[in-house]
Amino acid sequence: MSDFVESEAEESEEEYNDEGEVVPRVTKKFVEEEDDDEEEEEENLDDQDEQGNLKGFINDDDDEDEGEEDEGSDSGDSEDDVGHKKRKRTSFDDRLEDDDFDLIEENLGVKVKRGQKYRRVKKMSDDEDDDEEEYGKEEHEKEAIAEEIFQDGEGEEGQEAMEAPMAPPEEEEEDDEESDIDDFIVDDDGQPLKKPKWRKKLPGYTDAALQEAQEIFGVDFDYDEFEKYNEYDEELEEEYEYEDDEAEGEIRVRPKKTTKKRVSRRSIFEMYEPSELESSHLTDQDNEIRATDLPERFQLRSIPVKGAEDDELEEEADWIYRNAFATPTISLQESCDYLDRGQPASSFSRKGPSTIQKIKEALGFMRNQHFEVPFIAFYRKEYVEPELHINDLWRVWQWDEKWTQLRIRKENLTRLFEKMQAYQYEQISADPDKPLADGIRALDTTDMERLKDVQSMDELKDVYNHFLLYYGRDIPKMQNAAKASRKKLKRVREEGDEEGEGDEAEDEEQRGPELKQASRRDMYTICQSAGLDGLAKKFGLTPEQFGENLRDSYQRHETEQFPAEPLELAKDYVCSQFPTPEAVLEGARYMVALQIAREPLVRQVLRQTFQERAKLNITPTKKGRKDVDEAHYAYSFKYLKNKPVKELRDDQFLKICLAEDEGLLTTDISIDLKGVEGYGNDQTYFEEIKQFYYRDEFSHQVQEWNRQRTMAIERALQQFLYVQMAKELKNKLLAEAKEYVIKACSRKLYNWLRVAPYRPDQQVEEDDDFMDENQGKGIRVLGIAFSSARDHPVFCALVNGEGEVTDFLRLPHFTKRRTAWREEEREKKAQDIETLKKFLLNKKPHVVTVAGENRDAQMLIEDVKRIVHELDQGQQLSSIGVELVDNELAILYMNSKKSEAEFRDYPPVLRQAVSLARRIQDPLIEFAQVCSSDEDILCLKFHPLQEHVVKEELLNALYCEFINRVNEVGVDVNRAIAHPYSQALIQYVCGLGPRKGTHLLKILKQNNTRLESRTQLVTMCHMGPKVFMNCAGFLKIDTASLGDSTDSYIEVLDGSRVHPETYEWARKMAVDALEYDESAEDANPAGALEEILENPERLKDLDLDAFAEELERQGYGDKHITLYDIRAELSCRYKDLRTAYRSPNTEEIFNMLTKETPETFYIGKLIICNVTGIAHRRPQGESYDQAIRNDETGLWQCPFCQQDNFPELSEVWNHFDSGSCPGQAIGVKTRLDNGVTGFIPTKFLSDKVVKRPEERVKVGMTVHCRIMKIDIEKFSADLTCRTSDLMDRNNEWKLPKDTYYDFDAEAADHKQEEDMKRKQQRTTYIKRVIAHPSFHNINFKQAEKMMETMDQGDVIIRPSSKGENHLTVTWKVSDGIYQHVDVREEGKENAFSLGATLWINSEEFEDLDEIVARYVQPMASFARDLLNHKYYQDCSGGDRKKLEELLIKTKKEKPTFIPYFICACKELPGKFLLGYQPRGKPRIEYVTVTPEGFRYRGQIFPTVNGLFRWFKDHYQDPVPGITPSSSSRTRTPASINATPANINLADLTRAVNALPQNMTSQMFSAIAAVTGQGQNPNATPAQWASSQYGYGGSGGGSSAYHVFPTPAQQPVATPLMTPSYSYTTPSQPITTPQYHQLQASTTPQSAQAQPQPSSSSRQRQQQPKSNSHAAIDWGKMAEQWLQEKEAERRKQKQRLTPRPSPSPMIESTPMSIAGDATPLLDEMDR
């Protein structure tokens, strides 16, 4: 059935030409956008996931669309996109055109080997080509629409899209409507194939292989060829025409055979890799960005910034407020802005509705005036504060991008809706009287309104998927109709009506018949084409009505009841695809379920409910149970049960997803509680909502319809909605967790950048007479860096005020200790100290920084402080600061390409010293050094999970921090030119970027001039007004340094934060403050400004509020905050607003030197440490007299060190006095890997009492401990290594687990693992000491593994799990089949030795060699004979079913033969299955290999030939060995000639078997006669019903007895074994069969006799009556014997009357298939 579903969900692979011949098609492979990009709701995922439910009700014998190719899923929801199945294709012509090959290569993305090229007649028209193309296009028009609607390439709402490549120029103008399906062909990676690569014949090669290599590698490096072709250019540059292919508006590229000469000079684009050009910003696009008068970041945004009308701004502001500021996150997140951190999550919507107006103002500035965020934050404060600060403005900027994207997509979808509406109107107008078909749903204004009201990307996808469900298959028809009308209009317009019509007719004639629409066959379409829409509409509610019921939570719309039973109604819809009413109902339910699942209102309600109620359940995988220990990040949520997703915190869900990706956990998000006992009354969500689809009546008809509705609702939820909602919710939670991580990274960078440069004491600065030109005007810093490797030198770098390195110093022995043991080391250390002292004295730095590499930094900083103190005491040098600085940034800089380029000859540690000095000098500039195109900044450790967030998003967030801080501090352009070290800041200036910033510096360098005023940005640097407005206020000019070096007018305000637009107000304030007369001729506002700058306190008297009111009255707007800012700026120009530097506190020093954080080093953590010694408490004088004497030995014991071998008390005192007593041992000293010292008190060494720790641990030993206490000041930790603490069964030390932790599930898993461990640890055998080449001390599994590579018949002898007096001999019967033989030992000396005698069953052996030679090897030889037999079959290790299938198959092929096969049995090693099929049913028996030969039916055969010869003669004989039990399920058959009650046929059978072997047939006749049954030769033997057990495992259904239908036959006597099969009472009279003569008995001989295979003759011999006298005597004997047996039987408990049984062996013609009815029972002698 699934085959049919697949064939139904296919697309037609072949098309037919005019003559009806099949024209093979080139199948294009399309890969859709990723599932995040759009959840097209799994139209076909549904079909795949849900098809399993539909497999049973669609008939295979469908007559339409049989050759259609499986289209896979058109949804993005399937994680593993369904691959296209390979199908056999019949190709009538393999010689494809080059264009076809090109098309294949474009779509597959691989080169296709092309066959020999055949020259063809050139076609007059390209239209035929166009037509061929149309096949592949129509098929994917729905994808085209999706591409158009979501054309900006954005995935989930927050994801940034790749920049769309520039579209090629079109030669022909396209109609606007054509845009719906532009550029929708995608390659295997989902990228649009915008630029087809045409094969170009490269010159110089005729060899195909060489040319192919050249094409692959692109370059041939034959310089002679370059020379040869240089004049005319070695490559022909093809111009491409872009023509309208007239197939859904797709642009088709055709090479034009025109060539251009290229300039022979190589351009930059030929010399460098494109990636290098891109990273260096040298592409054409970069040049365009530089030239355009728009802020660089505006141009780089993936969604362009567009101007907006006031109405749209209002609408957008409201939307951004609701989504970004008023809607709380689903999970619990810290306040989104760390500037206001500490706010609880509930305060998310702290911004009131007044924010909306502020957002609108900000959007107006951004979209219409093109102001960047920092400009708005600094110069338009009145319009955004206090509601919005700078980070809120960035959020508005980001959400504006989302809004623009949503708006574009809505507009695209609206256009599509309008087109479909117009198309529907045309269709209906063509025949207005025709009623609408069931499958047609009119697209009305309600749908348009719903689209207009869409407020999120999720809702838009809902509307789009809803549209696809109802109108998806009409899209190609709509496009065709639109295309046809456009063509007609075009021709009419160009050539007039008459000519146009003629041409059109001619064109149609050339094109041939209309192409068949490529059909997408998904499950819904199949149901629709079968006309099930009508039945689906009779369920009583439309999806829209159900959605409204669901939204209002009451039955607003009553369910309409159709007046017929569902099954009765379904009969009208039965067809070839849905052959039964049940299948029809299943299909209708599928349609209803999918319609409900696609209804936007239903999805909106369910989405909201799902997010509120969703519960998270987590269980670990097998790997997770093993790997997630208490040190693992997933430990606290290893098991979770019903945790509401609303209670997830911060980045917790990201950790959960990571653990799931690593295969440690499985997560499940559901709307209902899972597995909670005692909550049975809680309704599931399904039970809550199904009532909205019910009709509350009790008639059978209504109940039946209610049942159908319930099943449809359940399917909609379980199969569609829950899965999709869980996925949506998971993506949202993951996005929130990632956003938290990005915010945490931003916060850390914010804290690093907010630190102001180091400032020495004011006195030091004033006394500094060393400020010459070389040193610069800033502070001088000496950076000291060292390596953690031993014996590496220490490097010092001196940096002047401008960040330039002026000197450096190498101290090779500075890391050695002053108190080192070796005198040589102490002397070298002293020399280095002296060298550093002189260096400090000469260079006089303001501060010394020491790298916080490890604990050694503490020693170095003490040494430096001591040197500084000595110099200060000697009044040789003012006191200078010594600071410890984190060297993480310095190490990153040390390894960067930038530092290598800047200090190529410096060793790495010296480069680190330079970075340390610069960092304390100005952290902002130093951090900017690692913001290169290599993205080095991401190597800094901001957050443990930073590598799991989207790199671009993290970079953008970090760059925002730089932009904020750089614009607050300002950038001195002239300093950046003079000192390239500070150039990195220019890219973050508002309005600029990496391209515009470097371009600005480049212009200034080319002009070899300094920037003397901000006006020059326009006049000299040609900056546009928009960029100038943005950046002018943040570029500062040091007007004081210009001094007399220039003749131009110096504007003092250029050195301040005052924006040029407000210079006049600043001057006015200065004039007013000084009370100058502005009307005077000699009034000089500039002079007033300079005076105010010297006496800023005069500004305090100004009434700025009145000034602001005056400005507002004059139309300048509200400027009161700006005026206060101007006053502050005039008081102190470009005052540094950063937090003053402070030395690191104790905790920061601890984290810096140990490289730990509170998350990685905490109380309760399990750690490993090395023992460094034993700690003792020195003895106190007053305790000397407490020595203890041992009365038994007479020796004295020291009360402290417990030494107990002192013969005299005086020796104990001497022991004290000499200082040789170490004192009382109080604990163990250890060292951790992070440099922290650990201490284990004696009582925490073990759960037992420990008096001497040195007996428990040794120095250098590694011990596992748990942290009890951390002392960050002393860098020490108290530890415990007691087993009870390490195990911590009571969870006193371990990290706390989640509130919803599932302890029960963990306990159950733990118990299961413990049981398994116990089972594995239990030794199944005792290791033995036995010298034999075949003996191995291994277990059962290891033996079988060893056997895999051994030969058939090889032996392994091993210990037995039965005990020490048993061995097991394992020998290889066949591949994968091994027999294990138990050997009993007797006469053992000990448990490990070999027994004197060995027994297998009742057979004795002297030693192992005898067992191998006399027992195993013969069996292996016999087995080999069977394995090599011509009728041997493997049958998957003796699989009965496989053997039966083989027999049935062979029997069908040769019905006149009786097939038989033998195969080794894996279930019973040592036995072989003998299968044969005389008639309709296969029969299977066992052949057992023994040392004597083959045992079959109780007889031993020494050869294979003898075995099969006997089998062929006796296969019809009954199988001996089964006696019926009294519990047999048998019934006494009804018979006219009833069986006498006093005869027990079972006993009779045993009696006959016990008779002498040489009894003649007359004797049997006499025995038969005494039963009182007359012979009735005409009676047909009973035909018993089929047995429910069957024979020998051959399956039920075999007849217990099968006899000939011939009425005149005579039964032949054989020993009777009554099988215990149940059967029905026969309808015919039954007579007891008589035993007739046999030439030789077929009764197997008794067990005591030597078995001799014998053959019997089946000749019918009619004995004359005259020979019966001998039989009478025997008859009397038999009768007497039977009477005795009967008497014994009567004494026993009365039994059921046994049934009479005809003889199983019926006399027949030899090898008659019809007469074979031997009941072959399994031989159970195992």
Curated annotation (Swiss-Prot):
<keyword id="KW-0143">Chaperone</keyword>
<dbReference type="GO" id="GO:0008380">
    <property type="term" value="P:RNA splicing"/>
</dbReference>
<dbReference type="GO" id="GO:0006368">
    <property type="term" value="P:transcription elongation by RNA polymerase II"/>
</dbReference>
<feature type="region of interest" description="Interaction with PAAF1">
    <location>
        <begin position="2"/>
        <end position="916"/>
    </location>
</feature>
<dbReference type="InterPro" id="IPR042066">
    <property type="entry name" value="Spt6_death-like"/>
</dbReference>
<dbReference type="InterPro" id="IPR012340">
    <property type="entry name" value="NA-bd_OB-fold"/>
</dbReference>
<dbReference type="Pfam" id="PF14633">
    <property type="entry name" value="SH2_2"/>
</dbReference>
<dbReference type="Pfam" id="PF14641">
    <property type="entry name" value="HTH_44"/>
</dbReference>
<feature type="modified residue" description="Phosphothreonine">
    <location>
        <position position="1718"/>
    </location>
</feature>
<dbReference type="InterPro" id="IPR032706">
    <property type="entry name" value="Spt6_HHH"/>
</dbReference>
<feature type="compositionally biased region" description="Basic and acidic residues">
    <location>
        <begin position="510"/>
        <end position="520"/>
    </location>
</feature>
<dbReference type="GO" id="GO:0006397">
    <property type="term" value="P:mRNA processing"/>
</dbReference>
<feature type="modified residue" description="Phosphothreonine">
    <location>
        <position position="1532"/>
    </location>
</feature>
<dbReference type="InterPro" id="IPR035018">
    <property type="entry name" value="Spt6_SH2_C"/>
</dbReference>
<dbReference type="Pfam" id="PF14639">
    <property type="entry name" value="YqgF"/>
</dbReference>
<dbReference type="GO" id="GO:0003677">
    <property type="term" value="F:DNA binding"/>
</dbReference>
<feature type="region of interest" description="Disordered">
    <location>
        <begin position="1636"/>
        <end position="1726"/>
    </location>
</feature>
<comment type="similarity">
    <text>Belongs to the SPT6 family.</text>
</comment>
<feature type="modified residue" description="Phosphoserine">
    <location>
        <position position="78"/>
    </location>
</feature>
<feature type="compositionally biased region" description="Acidic residues">
    <location>
        <begin position="169"/>
        <end position="190"/>
    </location>
</feature>
<feature type="modified residue" description="Phosphotyrosine">
    <location>
        <position position="1515"/>
    </location>
</feature>
<dbReference type="InterPro" id="IPR006641">
    <property type="entry name" value="YqgF/RNaseH-like_dom"/>
</dbReference>
<feature type="modified residue" description="Phosphoserine">
    <location>
        <position position="7"/>
    </location>
</feature>
<protein>
    <recommendedName>
        <fullName>Transcription elongation factor SPT6</fullName>
    </recommendedName>
</protein>
<keyword id="KW-0509">mRNA transport</keyword>
<dbReference type="InterPro" id="IPR017072">
    <property type="entry name" value="TF_Spt6"/>
</dbReference>
<feature type="domain" description="SH2">
    <location>
        <begin position="1325"/>
        <end position="1431"/>
    </location>
</feature>
<keyword id="KW-0508">mRNA splicing</keyword>
<dbReference type="GO" id="GO:0034728">
    <property type="term" value="P:nucleosome organization"/>
</dbReference>
<dbReference type="GO" id="GO:0051028">
    <property type="term" value="P:mRNA transport"/>
</dbReference>
<comment type="function">
    <text>Histone H3-H4 chaperone that plays a key role in the regulation of transcription elongation and mRNA processing. Enhances the transcription elongation by RNA polymerase II (RNAPII) and is also required for the efficient activation of transcriptional elongation by the HIV-1 nuclear transcriptional activator, Tat. Besides chaperoning histones in transcription, acts to transport and splice mRNA by forming a complex with IWS1 and the C-terminal domain (CTD) of the RNAPII subunit RPB1 (POLR2A).</text>
</comment>
<feature type="compositionally biased region" description="Acidic residues">
    <location>
        <begin position="126"/>
        <end position="136"/>
    </location>
</feature>
<dbReference type="GO" id="GO:0008023">
    <property type="term" value="C:transcription elongation factor complex"/>
</dbReference>
<feature type="domain" description="S1 motif">
    <location>
        <begin position="1213"/>
        <end position="1282"/>
    </location>
</feature>
<dbReference type="Pfam" id="PF14632">
    <property type="entry name" value="SPT6_acidic"/>
</dbReference>
<dbReference type="InterPro" id="IPR023323">
    <property type="entry name" value="Tex-like_dom_sf"/>
</dbReference>
<feature type="compositionally biased region" description="Acidic residues">
    <location>
        <begin position="59"/>
        <end position="80"/>
    </location>
</feature>
<feature type="compositionally biased region" description="Acidic residues">
    <location>
        <begin position="495"/>
        <end position="509"/>
    </location>
</feature>
<feature type="compositionally biased region" description="Acidic residues">
    <location>
        <begin position="32"/>
        <end position="50"/>
    </location>
</feature>
<feature type="modified residue" description="Phosphoserine">
    <location>
        <position position="12"/>
    </location>
</feature>
<dbReference type="InterPro" id="IPR028231">
    <property type="entry name" value="Spt6_YqgF"/>
</dbReference>
<dbReference type="InterPro" id="IPR012337">
    <property type="entry name" value="RNaseH-like_sf"/>
</dbReference>
